[in-house]
Amino acid sequence: MKKIKKKKIQKIVVIGGGTGTFTVLTALRNYSVPLHLTAIVTMADSGGSTGRLRDQYGVLPPGDIRRALVALSDASQTLRKLFNYRFETCDLKDHSFGNIFLTALEKMTGNFGCAVKEAARVLNINGEVIPVTLDNINLCAELADGSIIRGETNIDIPKHDPSVQIKKVWLEPVARLNPEAKKAILAADKAGYRAIVVDS
């Protein structure tokens, strides 16, 4: 009797955030080879619903994490759609349910990492979603004319003259790498994982 060779699970780490990471994770889930996916998500988003929640509640940015969780979710279509549902009127206008859910979990647990793990359990994700840092950071840029821009959204959607080139970028404060993200990256390198860096 011929022995059936079991396919080796390919382990892939995706580093990025926003729509780009969601698209890559969604595509990889449809890949014919068995995969274990780990998303290491950027934490500098400051626009839209995420920016408002950061300003009002002092939480870490939930939006990019939410997208990665939904991309890896094995929950029902209704639950996945619920997490992406965006309110259209009144005080909650433009907020997504998933962003509010993650904000509430962070306030309850006092730890964004714990909030992400609990949301991952609720959404029954197939893989891992890890914030790259647990520090409350902002992306900053110095322009060629010497002016300083703070906040990712102010860089992406400039209020300044967009023809002025960016001279350098940095994080404020200097971010500490989440130990779980470091562990995943080192394990990936050791095991010969494939790492994909997504420009979000």
What function would you assign to each model-found segment?
Residues 2-12, 19-29, 35-39, 102-200:
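Conserved catalytic alpha/beta core of Sir2/sirtuin-type deacylases, generalized to analogous enzyme cores
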Residues 38-110, 118-123, 128:
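Glycine-rich nucleotide/cofactor/substrate-binding loop typically near the N-terminus or early
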Residues 27-31, 53-56:
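Short, glycine/charged-enriched secondary-structure capping and boundary segments
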Residues 14-16, 96:
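Short glycine/serine/threonine-biased micro-segments
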Residues 1-6, 80-84:
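Short secondary-structure boundary segments
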